[in-house]
């Protein structure tokens, strides 16, 4: 006499394997890629360089700083969303929900992804994909919420494009300081 749970049919095993493969595939699809912007990127001529570069630092410091970004592919462009350590001025502001995504760590409680500083880097030689040296908490936050982050970033990009087509992006508070002002051609605006 068989006891419950001892014998498993081939059909049950096949179904279990199929479920595991689907879960593995969906995890691979959600794989977060971290990109590091290389120095040559900052040597380009930008229309609005202050919004791409750290305006509080000199040119040499800007070119040597390591920018950890979350990579996003959308509409034949590669977007890099910078992980910034201090978004303290943003959380209380009403635009925070549309412009940033909090990714705090114990050492950096105000860290997050800043959609205002998204850059377009379609040339793979200007960035490298590598494992980011960030806290496990930050890594898990981005991995677990990648689809939400992706959708928020796409909403921001689409909103910017809509404003730019009307030549209003410099007047709308959400886009006034956007790094995307430097990538109008890549976005199909010009």
What would you call each of these model-derived segments?
Residues 5-64:
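GIY-YIG nuclease catalytic motif and its immediate N-terminal context
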Residues 10-29, 102-190:
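C-terminal terminal-subdomain/extension
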Residues 36-38, 81, 119-121:
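Residues in well-ordered beta-strands of folded domains
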Residues 41-42, 87, 125:
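Residue-level detector of flexible, active-site-proximal loop/helix-junction positions
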Residues 58-62, 73-111:
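Compact nucleic-acid interaction/catalytic patches
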Residues 67-70:
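Short beta-strand-centered aromatic/proline hotspots
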């Amino acid at each position: 006499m068989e006891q419950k749970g001892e014998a498993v049919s081939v059909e049950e095993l096949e179904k279990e394997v199929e479920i595991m493969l689907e879960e593995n595939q969906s995890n691979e699809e959600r794989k977060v890629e971290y990109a590091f912007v290389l120095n040559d990127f900052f040597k380009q001529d930008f229309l609005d360089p202050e919004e791409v570069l750290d305006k509080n630092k000199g040119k040499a410091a800007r070119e040597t700083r390591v920018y950890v970004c979350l990579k996003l592919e959308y509409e034949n462009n590669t977007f890099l969303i910078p992980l910034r350590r201090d978004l303290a001025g943003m959380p209380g502001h009403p635009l925070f929900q549309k412009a940033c995504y909090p990714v705090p760590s114990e050492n950096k409680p105000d860290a997050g992804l800043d959609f205002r500083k998204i850059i377009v880097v379609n040339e793979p030689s200007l960035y490298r994909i590598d494992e980011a040296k960030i806290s496990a908490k930050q890594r898990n936050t981005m991995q677990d919420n990648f689809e939400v982050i992706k959708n928020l970033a796409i909403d921001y990009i689409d909103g910017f494009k809509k404003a730019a087509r009307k030549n209003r992006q410099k007047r709308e508070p959400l886009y006034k300081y956007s790094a995307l002002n430097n990538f109008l051609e890549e976005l199909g605006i010009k």
